[in-house]
């Protein structure tokens, strides 16, 4: 026994000496300690984070919702009524509270990604479902049965909402959806309706900062390339400082043009037919560019060179799109083609090209309509398969350039803060409008969800705990109307009670005017896609939180430990850097 203890002590001394040598000769690796919370305590702390975040977000809901001012790391504070912007800005010092808040942010982001709006509604629903779920689990309900009940109820509500949705098509209906999502600003709704009318459902509508006090709509018909002329000597209209080419030949080349000899044949083709020439290539190097300018100034050849838009694979795709639109071919080494062998059939053409210092607009390309449609179909398929938001955005832009055009909403205002706040609302309104066109509309102001709660009373369940799960959703569906009314300064419970007493499925509370109206006739409507996505995402994350039994987070590092870690190199003293 003594020998065993002696050996153990000896091994301990050796290990200790080894650790001391190691601490003097090498950096130590520190692992963060973890804190674990269980059961009711864990859920209560997460709920606190959810409630605090939801309280900040819900004040923006409805036509009389308030602004939230957000401090930024640089520049002026941001003023916004956009729910997802408020949610993203919130971080808590308490890590477990932060876990709850982060999951609500996930709901808001998911809803925003799919539907583009409804983030405030999703946040309010998440808070309501999770709060009731926590109470029920604490009272002894089976968490998994609650989750099944919640899931059954959500499926029933979604089916009910889909059966009541109405498709929209007119500009007036589109304007109504945009107006509601822009917090009642009619001008924004009408601007979006005009933009959609101009470019169609598949057209791209972009939002930019305006340079005036007013909102403006600029529509670019045809294909717009975000590249301008390579030299101002190509300008043909001194008044507008643009190069305008009527019925031009278009050379589309994938590589750089380094010598004039390579494009002599193309210049001869243009001169022989007395037609202008547009050159689209990766670049035109100085010698070739100088020769083109001399030909324009002295020989009177109308010519203009621009750089190919995009980079890498995206550039190739853009050039292929341009070739399809203009009826030309992309001259590329990969297919064994070179500029010396170009003939007229390889050149594209269009009705008119306008080139400024920043961009190029190609109108009425001569490409085969069937070929253009096939190209559009390829892009649509790529959009469906893509998992990258960036790639989807670029593909959508390409589709718009080929099929409809591009509309630019220029948002004006008296200050940077005002423009930023308006851009948030316009973005929400635009996304909601697209969602409404896609899946249809429902009576707005939260009443579609409120009346769907009635349908759950007859929903069959397997046991009492599942029934409680259904009741949790029933109660949560009342919160959007309650919150909108409360933000308008009236008692939310009274409004909810009065609406549930009557049978008209379109009757709701107009918080802007303070009266009960037919929501559809009054133009207060919500897109089905927005409401459906908000409810499904909220229920999904709330169910996960309700069935959580443990939370693991990093413990904050103690200052004394940090100091000790820094002193671990004591044996290396005297080495100053």
Curated annotation (Swiss-Prot):
> Which Pfam families does the record associate with it?
Cpn60_TCP1
Q: What induces it?
A: By heat shock.
According to the UniProt entry, which residues carry Phosphoserine? Answer: 151
Q: Which UniProt keywords apply?
A: ATP-binding, Chaperone, Mitochondrion, Nucleotide-binding, Phosphoprotein, Stress response, Transit peptide
UniProt feature coiled coil, ranges: none
Q: Does the keyword Hydrolase apply?
A: no
Indicate what this protein is called per its UniProt record: Chaperonin CPN60, mitochondrial
- Native organism is Arabidopsis thaliana
What's the source species' lineage? Eukaryota, Viridiplantae, Streptophyta, Embryophyta, Tracheophyta
What would be the name of the gene that encodes this protein? Answer: CPN60
């Amino acid at each position: 026994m003594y020998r065993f203890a002696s050996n153990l002590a000896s091994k301990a001394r050796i290990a200790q000496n080894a650790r001391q040598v190691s601490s003097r000769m090498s950096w130590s690796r520190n692992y963060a300690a973890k804190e674990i919370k269980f059961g009711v305590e864990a859920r209560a702390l997460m709920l606190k984070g959810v409630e605090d975040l939801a309280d900040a977000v819900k004040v923006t809901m409805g036509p009389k919702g308030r602004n939230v001012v957000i401090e930024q790391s640089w520049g002026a504070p941001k003023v916004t009524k956009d729910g997802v912007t408020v949610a993203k800005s919130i971080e808590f010092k308490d890590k477990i509270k932060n876990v709850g808040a982060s999951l609500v942010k996930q709901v808001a982001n998911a809803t925003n990604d799919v539907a583009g709006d409804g983030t405030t509604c999703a946040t309010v629903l998440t808070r309501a479902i999770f709060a009731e779920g926590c109470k029920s689990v604490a009272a002894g309900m089976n968490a998994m049965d609650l989750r099944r009940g919640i899931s059954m109820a959500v499926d029933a509500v979604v089916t009910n909402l889909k059966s009541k949705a109405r498709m929209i098509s007119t500009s007036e209906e589109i304007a109504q959806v945009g107006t509601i999502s822009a917090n009642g600003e009619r001008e924004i709704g009408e601007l979006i309706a005009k933009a959609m009318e101009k470019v169609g459902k598949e057209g791209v509508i972009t939002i930019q900062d305006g340079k005036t006090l007013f909102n403006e709509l600029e529509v670019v018909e045809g294909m717009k390339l975000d590249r301008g002329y390579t030299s101002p000597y190509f300008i043909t209209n001194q008044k507008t400082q643009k190069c305008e080419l009527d019925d031009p030949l278009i050379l589309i080349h994938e590589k750089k043009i380094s010598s004039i000899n390579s494009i002599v044949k193309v210049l001869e083709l243009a001169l022989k037919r007395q037609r202008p020439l547009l050159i689209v290539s990766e670049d035109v190097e100085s010698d070739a560019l100088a020769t083109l300018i001399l030909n324009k100034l002295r020989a009177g050849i109308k010519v203009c060179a621009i750089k190919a838009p995009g980079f890498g694979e995206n550039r190739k795709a853009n050039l292929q799109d341009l070739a399809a639109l203009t009826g030309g071919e992309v001259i590329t080494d990969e297919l064994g083609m070179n500029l010396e062998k170009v003939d007229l059939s390889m050149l594209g053409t269009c009705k008119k090209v306008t080139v400024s210092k920043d961009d190029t607009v190609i109108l009425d390309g001569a490409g085969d309509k069937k070929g253009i449609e096939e190209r559009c179909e390829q892009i649509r398929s790529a959009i469906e398969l893509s998992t990258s938001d960036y790639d989807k955005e670029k593909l959508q832009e390409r589709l718009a350039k080929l099929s409809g055009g591009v509309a630019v909403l220029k948002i004006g205002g008296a200050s940077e803060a005002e423009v930023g706040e308006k851009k948030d609302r316009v973005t929400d309104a635009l996304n909601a409008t697209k969602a409404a066109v896609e899946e249809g509309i429902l009576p707005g102001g939260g009443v579609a969800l409120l009346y769907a709660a009635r349908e759950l009373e007859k929903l069959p369940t397997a046991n009492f705990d599942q029934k409680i799960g259904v009741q949790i959703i029933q109660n949560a569906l009342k919160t959007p109307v309650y919150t909108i009314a409360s933000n308008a300064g009236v008692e939310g419970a009274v409004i909810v009670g009065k609406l549930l007493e009557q049978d008209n499925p379109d009757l709701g509370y107009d918080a802007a005017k303070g009266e009960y109206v037919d929501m559809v006739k009054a133009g207060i409507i919500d897109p089905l896609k927005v409401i459906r996505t908000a409810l499904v995402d909220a229920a999904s994350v709330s169910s996960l939180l309700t069935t959580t039994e443990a939370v693991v987070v990093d413990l904050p590092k103690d200052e004394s430990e940090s100091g000790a870690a820094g002193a671990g190199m004591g044996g290396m003293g005297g080495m100053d850097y």
